[in-house]
């Protein structure tokens, strides 16, 4: 656990210091690769994330492309079981993600910062996701040899993947990690609740698949 926390701090220090131009260039390359990947996978229902101001792949272009290509787009909201009334996997009132369907790019652009991290999130009344084909996943670091992912430590995405499998008889969407070149790390120590990616798309445009 200490090794994982140290690695997280080291990677965060690097990516938080990156120039915006570097992140923008890599994010554009990733968006083009993701567009091709989703088209070839014949996917229709895609979950993405609203990127933070720094330290991760930006998703504005990806979301715009998804709407242009006729995908159904879903974005996450941070909530907790006492509010959502969803079943509990851990302690009472623990935090988790809900993905909501966005009907247009304008709807996305009109989102306001809210929630514990002041991210642009959907309002609670918007339609929730059921079946998802693809989830585009953020992270602090990714291992392109094994598919391992290290998040920010709160467990939101691993919790969502576990909930999804319980609700859908063991099935899960295609999990696609979006990774700046500066986020590539190996090895990444995993705990029993950590989910690995099905593929990772990197800032140089490469796509790494895992069985």
Curated annotation (Swiss-Prot):
Which SUPFAM superfamilies does its entry note? NagB/RpiA/CoA transferase-like
* PTM text: N-glycosylated.
Q: Which domain of life is it from?
A: Eukaryota
Report the GO terms under cellular component: cytoplasm; mitochondrion
Q: What lineage does UniProt assign to this protein's organism?
A: Eukaryota, Fungi, Dikarya, Ascomycota, Saccharomycotina
Extra notes? Present with 468 molecules/cell in log phase SD medium.
GO biological process, alphabetically ordered: folic acid-containing compound biosynthetic process; tetrahydrofolate interconversion
**What catalytic activity does the UniProt entry give for this protein?**
(6S)-5-formyl-5,6,7,8-tetrahydrofolate + ATP = (6R)-5,10-methenyltetrahydrofolate + ADP + phosphate
Q: What is its main location?
A: mitochondrion
The molecular function GO annotations come to: 5-formyltetrahydrofolate cyclo-ligase activity; ATP binding
Phenotype of the disrupted gene, per the record: Abolishes methenyltetrahydrofolate synthase activity and leads to accumulation of folinic acid. Leads to a striking methionine deficiency when combined with ADE16 and ADE17, 2 isoenzymes involved in the purine synthesis.
What family is reported?
A: Belongs to the 5-formyltetrahydrofolate cyclo-ligase family.
Q: Where does ATP bind?
A: 4-8, 151-158, 194
What EC number(s) does this enzyme carry? Answer: 6.3.3.2
Which pairs of Cys residues are joined through disulfide bonds in the record? none
Q: Localized where?
A: Mitochondrion
Q: What function is annotated for this protein?
A: Only enzyme known to utilize 5-formyltetrahydrofolate (folinic acid) as substrate. Contributes to tetrahydrofolate metabolism in an alternative way of folate biosynthesis. May regulate carbon flow through the folate-dependent one-carbon metabolic network that supplies carbon for the biosynthesis of purines, thymidine and amino acids.
The name this protein goes by in its record: 5-formyltetrahydrofolate cyclo-ligase
Entry's InterPro entries?
FTHF_cligase (IPR002698), FTHF_cligase-like_sf (IPR024185), NagB/RpiA_transferase-like (IPR037171)
**Record Pfam families:** 5-FTHF_cyc-lig
Q: Which UniProt keywords apply?
A: ATP-binding, Glycoprotein, Ligase, Mitochondrion, Nucleotide-binding
Q: Which residues bind substrate?
A: 56, 152-156
């Amino acid at each position: 656990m200490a090794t994982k926390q140290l690695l997280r701090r080291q990677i965060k220090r690097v990516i938080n210091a990156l120039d915006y131009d570097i992140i923008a260039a890599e994010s554009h390359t990733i968006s083009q690769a993701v567009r091709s990947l989703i088209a070839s996978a014949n996917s229709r229902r895609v979950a993405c994330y609203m990127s933070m101001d720094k330290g991760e792949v930006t998703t504005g272009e990806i979301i715009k492309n998804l709407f242009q290509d006729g995908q159904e787009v879903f974005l996450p909201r941070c909530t907790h079981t006492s509010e959502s009334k969803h079943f509990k996997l851990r302690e009472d009132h623990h935090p988790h993600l809900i993905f909501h369907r966005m009907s247009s790019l304008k709807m996305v652009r009109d989102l306001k910062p809210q929630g514990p991290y002041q991210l642009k999130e959907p309002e609670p009344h918007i339609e929730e996701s059921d079946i998802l084909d693809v989830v585009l996943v953020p992270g602090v670091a990714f291992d392109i040899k094994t598919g391992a992912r290290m998040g920010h430590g709160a467990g939101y995405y691993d919790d969502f993947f576990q909930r999804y499998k319980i609700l859908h008889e063991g099935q899960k969407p295609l999990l696609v990690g979006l990774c700046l070149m500066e986020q590539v790390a190996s090895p990444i120590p995993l705990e029993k609740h950590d989910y690995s990616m099905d593929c990772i798309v990197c800032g140089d445009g490469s796509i790494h698949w895992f069985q």
